[in-house]
Amino acid sequence: MTRLIIFCIAVCLAGCATHKKTTVQHKAAPKPTAVVKEETAPAPTGMSETGIAWQKSDRLIPVLEEAQKQHKPVFLEFYATWCGPCKVMEREVFSQPDIYDYLNKNFLSYHVDVDSPTGKPIAEIYEIKGMPTVIFVDPKGVALETELGLITASRFKKVADSALAKMKK
């Protein structure tokens, strides 16, 4: 019995002696204007039926460049195909004519599937923590307004109005 206890203590001490201390190096988050060369995922089912004129680009950078030419902010919608609240926003907010007309007139709209290989880097740039997330950015990619979670059409319009006002300053 004594030998068993001594053996167990020896094994524990040996395990402690060989344990290496590891450090995790966190890379700095890239700036929103960082080049993202990945392609974007296609719109979720029905998204094109909302009336929003989604930018058809395989990268975010050309959308920002177009926003600079047009002097417009960009509406970024971060979603996931499995996200129930994302589908509710699509159905109850983005399908309203006053919302999509307002977006089409005042913003360039771009959507990002956070689970796609091409959407993940963009979601990392903007530190997306949940879906749906809407971010309004200036043509340089700097966030003007951010809203996380399911929101009403009236709240969405207030956030968009605020972003537009900040853009005009």
Residue ranges and their predicted role:
Residues 1-5:
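Positively charged n-region of N-terminal signal peptides that target proteins for export
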Residues 14-15:
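C-terminal motif of bacterial Sec signal peptides marking the signal peptidase cleavage site
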Residues 20-34:
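Short, low-complexity, disordered segments immediately C-terminal to signal peptides
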Residues 54-73, 103:
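A short beta-strand-turn-helix
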Residues 54-57, 92-118:
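Thiol-based oxidoreductase modules, predominantly thioredoxin-like and allied folds used
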Residues 69-84:
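Short active-site neighborhood of thiol/selenol oxidoreductases, capturing the structured segment around
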Residues 80-94:
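Conserved redox-active cysteine motifs that mediate thiol-disulfide chemistry
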Residues 129-169:
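Non-catalytic, surface beta->alpha helical segment in thiol-disulfide oxidoreductase systems
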